[in-house]
């Protein structure tokens, strides 16, 4: 089984995914980290040198390589579900979990976060607000195809993990060890 965590940048996919994997006794991977290790470049460097299209193609390669893995929690890049047929592929190959946050919380996290995110790097507060609201609106068409949606607003990592595990229990009413 594969669990794919999807959602906008800053939604907690990596943090929650790592915790969920530990709770399940599964492996955890972050697709951005895999790309960075494979290329020897940070995500901002990839965007600068190769552009977003190249990055999205690399994401798809990584996704395809992960489909053969089992008992794994996968934190995807925020845009991964929105390109090619990635979302459909993830839904066929496992359980997709959308970590939903309202734009204002995403904006706050991005403004005060310590991760260099190339799509928002040089935006002033107004530009950031506009970017998040417009991009989230476009991406939610894909995010809303997830099998499970968790409102992660005001949730600790532990409580968000518990919500996911509870939703998995409901999804697998035979209680398959979650």
Residue ranges and their predicted role:
Residues 14:
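Walker A/P-loop
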């Amino acid at each position: 089984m594969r669990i794919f965590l999807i959602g906008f940048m800053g939604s907690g996919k990596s943090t929650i995914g790592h915790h969920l994997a530990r709770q399940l006794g599964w492996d955890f991977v972050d697709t951005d980290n895999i790309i960075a290790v494979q290329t020897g470049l940070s995500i901002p460097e990839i965007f600068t040198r190769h552009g977003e299209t190249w990055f999205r193609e690399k994401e798809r390669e990584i996704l395809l390589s992960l489909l053969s893995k089992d008992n794994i929690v996968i934190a995807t890049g925020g845009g991964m579900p929105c390109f090619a047929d990635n979302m459909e592929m993830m839904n066929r190959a496992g359980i997709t979990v959308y970590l939903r946050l309202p734009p204002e919380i995403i904006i706050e996290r991005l403004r005060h976060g310590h991760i260099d995110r190339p799509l928002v790097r040089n935006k002033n507060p107004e530009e950031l607000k506009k970017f998040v609201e417009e991009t989230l609106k476009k991406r939610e068409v894909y995010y809303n195809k997830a099998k499970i949606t968790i409102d992660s607003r005001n949730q600790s990592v532990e409580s968000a993990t518990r919500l996911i595990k509870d939703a998995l229990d409901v999804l697998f009413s035979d209680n398959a060890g979650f």
